[in-house]
Every structure is written in C-alpha cells, then in structure tokens.
Regions:
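Glycine-centered signal
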Residues: 1-2, 18, 315
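Bacterial N-terminal signal peptides
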Residues: 11-22
Length: 432
C-alpha cells in the first residue's frame, strides 16, 4: 500500500500546521463563512449548497433544538468568499440532494418521493413521482435521471434471508425472518417519466452478506451511484470499466461495485483495509480524464462502525487504483487532531483540475479544499449541516457566464493560540 506521508502530509509538520486551522466543532464559539482562502493555490469556483438546517451551527442549544426537524427551503450558489450569487426556493426537505444542469436548471430530490426540476428563476418545469432517491441522483449524458430506491425486497427473496443472532453496537437482535430487508433498486427515468432501465440488488448480491453494525432491515443502504467516465482502463481493453457502466457504493457492507449497464452483471468490486477498512463510505466516483489521478476511484470514508473500531470517529478521503486496489492517496488528520475531520453520515469530495481535492464534511457544514500534501487552501463553514455540496465552474451555465467573475479575496485566519475575545466592556457592540 503506497500511502506515502503526502497523503496526510508530505511533511508531518505541514499537516500539523494545517490541522491547527481546522474548526473542531466541539467548541461553542467558532466563525462561519469563509475562514481560509488562498486564491493563488486554491481552485476557485462556485459552490452549490443545500442545508439540513439553517441553524445547525448556532451557538444556542435551545435554538438548535427548536429547529430540529425543520428544513430550510433554499438552495444557494456561493462564491469562494461566501457571497450568495443565486438562490432557488424549493420544497423544504431534510436531505435536498441536487444537481445543477448546464442549462441553469436545478434538479432536486424533494419530499414525498418527488424529483423536481426548477429553471434558473425557480419555476418548476418537470417532476417525477414515486421513486424517492433520497441518497443520490445523477443526470446521465442523455439527460435521463438515474435514481435510487430503497424498498422492501420481494417476499420470495426475503425467505432466503437466514436467521442469525447478531449483537450490533446498540444491542442483540435476530436478523432474518423477523425483519423485512430493504433492497437497493436503480431506475433510469426519461423526461417523459418512463423507466427505461432498472437494476435490483437482490437479483445480484447475496442477501446474507451483511454488517452486524447496521440498523434493522437496512441491508445495503446504497448511497451513491455514478456512471463511469471515459477512462484509461477501458481504452486499454478492460471491458469492466466501459464508460456508462454504473459505480455503486453499498454503504452498509463497505463495498463499491461496478455494474455492467448492458448485462446488469456486477463486473468489479472493491474496498480497502487501511486502519480497519472502509466504514460507511459515501460518494464513490471514478476521477475523470484530464484530472490528476484520472481512472482512480475516490470516496469519502466516513469512519462509522469500522472493523476493530480502528478509525471510528475519523473520516478519510481515499483514492484507490481499481486494478490493484492499492491506496494511491489518503487525506486524514493525524494524532489527537484526527477528531477534527469527521462526518458520521453523508459527505462528498471531488478531484479538481489543479490536483487539489474538494471536501464537504456534511455533518458540521464545513467545506474545504486541500492540496495533495494536505494543506488547506480554502475553508467555508456553513450556517448548518449540508447535503453533499458540489463544485460549479464559473462558466458552467449561460447565466453564470453573464455574471462578472467574482472577486477572489484572500482570507488569512488568526492564530488560534493568540486570538482572544475581549470582555464585553472593552469592545464596541459587534466587535470581537
């Protein structure tokens, strides 16, 4: 395994320094908005943000508690300095998975198993009902939508589930005939609402393959799907990685699969064993041609329910060579600082054109960008937790091309060891 210290930091001192600038979110007081920005070293873009809650990072526990279960109904496009460039008002929902189209339309996974498409001005121009697709949704090159459903598996398959006494972290239970297993179903839907392709995990995976640490009945919990891009493996003759085949992440069994789109067979599977192995990961993608690491698979390894509890509570970004399954690169915080990068659920990442990696630590609402050596060159702390925010190029839509290019203003954070909040009597109102 070639982790090389650059995965955490080429120089241990560099990452230790970078780790000092990270909000730990155990404190009551911390800034929000853009907290770090080095324009000369960051890859600058817009960021598309949707929230779980508008007050998740409010200092008052009472305010946070009163907002529990209330989801804001806006999705925002911000620049690197945190300025809001555009807003869509949408049907409020806790997860709000969304994708921006090159036309400027926004496709959004909303409540009541409804997928919405809004135009730039916020008008609903398309809906699809009946497939929830809460965890992920992809726009395919033909403009069809690839959706995920988690419905009970058919009864004839349910009977194949063996009774097993298991003792997950929250107490013993019987897995098998006593609980209904939710499956994983993929549907490709066209703009007329027709299902033109479908795939069902219970036809292809062993129903008795499970993790004892997962919730009752939640067999796979597929949380991300991604069509394979053009890639060097297929160019060299490896049919498993045909562009358009589907990369699927089965969170609860800690495995990533490739599904042959034509035959529907599983043609590849992978995981990793670094520090106890993959643990409830999200957002597995193959890095696109033209980007550093092209052809490798990159994922957000949350660090929840790890084997032997080896990195429980410590999140990694892991880049894998899909041929050898060797780890090519890892981002993590080290030592006692490791608690400072952790998202129990959700999360995303993206390899950027300059070799940096964009990361969204969704549970805390912290979005940041790291160089290959681990140095943080941009960081933004949202008003609350986020739902896998995405990188949007400056020229991605006609509407964005018509806007002036945003200012890219350096933000240098204070030294945490020297920064002090003065007593109220010694400062003007609003000053710190």
């Amino acid at each position: 395994m070639t982790i090389m210290k650059q995965t955490r930091s080429i120089s241990a001192g560099l990452l230790a320094l970078a780790a000092l600038t990270q909000p730990a979110f155990a404190q009551t007081v911390f800034p929000t908005g853009t907290t770090i920005y080095t324009p000369a070293e960051a890859h600058s873009s817009y960021i598309l943000i949707s929230d779980h809650t508008a007050v998740g990072n409010h200092p008052s526990a009472r305010v946070r508690a009163e907002a529990e279960g209330a989801s804001p109904g806006d999705i925002r496009l911000i620049d690197m300095n945190g300025n809001v460039v555009h807003t869509w008002e949408v049907a409020p929902f806790f997860n709000k998975r969304c994708r921006l189209l090159p036309s400027g339309n926004l496709v959004y996974v909303g409540p009541n198993k409804t997928i919405y498409e809004y135009d730039w001005d916020g008008n609903v121009v398309w809906t699809h009902e009946g497939i929830g697709s809460v965890n992920d949704m992809r726009i395919l090159p033909n403009n069809n939508r690839l959706l995920i459903a988690h419905e009970p598996i058919p009864e004839e398959y349910q009977r194949q589930v063996r009774d097993v006494e298991i003792a997950p972290w929250w107490g013993p239970r019987l897995r098998g005939s006593g609980e209904t297993q939710l499956g994983a179903d993929l549907y490709e839907v066209n703009l007329d609402g027709e299902v033109v392709w479908e795939w069902h995990a219970h036809n292809h995976l062993d129903l008795n393959l499970f993790s004892p640490a997962t919730p009752e009945g939640d067999w796979l919990h597929v949380n991300s799907v991604a069509p394979l891009p053009e890639n060097k493996w297929y160019d060299a003759g490896d049919e498993r990685f045909r562009p358009g085949n589907i990369l699927l992440n089965a969170r609860n069994i800690n495995t990533v699969y490739v599904i042959d789109k034509e035959t529907k067979r599983i043609v590849w599977e992978g995981t990793h064993n670094y520090k106890g192995g993959m643990a409830h990961a999200h957002e597995a993608e193959m890095i696109e041609k033209g980007l550093p690491g092209a052809g490798n698979i990159i994922l957000f390894d949350n660090g929840l329910f790890t084997r032997h509890r080896a990195h429980t509570g410590q999140t990694f970004i892991v880049e894998l060579d899909p041929i050898t399954l060797e780890i090519v690169w890892v981002y993590e915080t080290e030592g006692y600082a490791n608690i400072k990068f952790f998202s129990k659920t959700m999360g995303t990442q993206k390899r950027l054109p300059n070799g940096n990696t964009y990361i969204a630590e969704d549970n805390t609402g912290r979005l940041f960008q790291v160089k290959p050596d681990g140095e943080i060159v941009w960081e933004y702390v949202n008003r609350g937790g986020t739902t896998r925010p995405s990188v949007i190029p400056y020229d991605f839509t006609p509407q964005l091309r018509a806007l002036p290019r945003p200012e890219e203003l350096t933000v240098t954070p204070p030294n945490n060891l020297e920064w002090r909040i003065a007593p109220d009597i010694h400062r003007e109102k609003g000053e710190y």
